[in-house]
Curated annotation (Swiss-Prot):
This is DNA-binding protein TV0008. GO terms for cellular component: cytosol. Signal peptide: none annotated. SUPFAM superfamilies: Double-stranded DNA-binding domain (SSF46950). Residues 18-37 are annotated as: Disordered.
Length: 115
């Protein structure tokens, strides 16, 4: 095999690697774009069905329990998309929903025994 052929193989491999990396970057950018679109759609729905104090309450819950806030948001968005929410949700409604979701949950108690 001549030096020219080896050099051409190396160039071809490098070009393929660069193309593969560019493709991966493009796919990652597309996925990020889709996540942003979905996030904007969710925020728009929540702005339509929640009053400002309810949104603030949910954001405060998100600081402490992001999983609980996501759960409440998902339920509200699902109900709104099914047409089952026919009024603006107030802060007191959010408090009721949160209390119902957390009343049966018991936090595990960790005891540390020293010798």
């Amino acid at each position: 095999m001549s030096d020219d052929e080896e050099l051409e193989k190396i160039r071809r491999r490098q070009m393929e690697e660069l193309q593969r990396q560019a493709m991966q970057r493009q796919m990652a950018e597309e996925e990020e774009k889709q996540r942003e679109i979905e996030k904007a759609r969710r925020q728009q729905i929540l702005r339509q069905i929640l009053d400002p104090s309810a949104r603030e309450r949910l954001n405060n819950v998100r600081l402490v329990r992001p999983d609980l806030a996501d759960n409440v948001e998902n339920q509200l968005i699902q109900l709104a998309s099914m047409g089952r929410i026919n009024r603006i949700i107030k802060e007191s409604d959010i408090i009721d929903i949160l209390s119902k979701l957390t009343e049966n949950k018991r936090e595990p108690k960790i005891e540390r025994r020293s010798k």
